[in-house]
């Protein structure tokens, strides 16, 4: 990893190494070691806020073309009292990434780092646009695009938030990534986290059936499952959560945060936000978090968090 960051490895060899890493599932220890090096390469421009921070960044790549669920979740959780440091990027595929939809909604992705961090105490949420915080990786971007496949760096994205959040909800699109990602979070010292793989292959908790969870607390990992109908939420097919182009996804994001979305869009955000509220200690259980999240959307409080962040980054 240090060789890549220092550009000491030839591009041809880099491509071969990335392809080799893709051929095996990395262990939690390997992911944690690589993430630790990347974290050291992106020092903060100033002191870290003395707040308990939570991130909602997942691996993406589930191919389901849902709307930007975890992005909406960030603002809903903030409206419920969590301090959310959302780490994200543009989409590397044909789908719409968190940065794409937030930029379309008016968020300034190029705000200076002190301004981005400084938004947290007032807005309760901020967005760290990954390319601006990881300049050492810029040189690898053309090679990664040229390979045309997902690489280990897609897994590292959720592990290298520069603010090193205390808590996290991390969605994975493959069930085999549940344990490695949970182990990596534990090794990196995250206080409490949820790694989730949704029914139907989603990298979010799903309304279509049970979601598989790994709960990380104080360095230990345990398995659990989440069933939406037991939390008072209506089951819904994947088709009810599908997004579209950036304009469509922006419209859905705004509708969700303003309390005027469809019931499945609202409920899947509430389900995932409840996981965040539990991880951040803002709800005693996931079940307790669901009504808090629903109220934040219905009242427009989640939209006001978005407006506060948009104004803070002008």
Named regions from a protein language model:
Residues 13-16, 85-87, 195:
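Short beta-strand segments at enzyme active-site cores
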Residues 25-88:
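Active-site cofactor/substrate anionic-group-binding motifs, chiefly glycine-
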Residues 40-43, 47, 66, 81, ...:
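Glycine-rich anion-binding loops and their surrounding alpha/beta cores
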Residues 62-74, 87, 93-96, 137, ...:
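Short glycine/serine/threonine-rich phosphate/pyrophosphate-binding segments
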Residues 91-107:
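Active-site-proximal loop->helix
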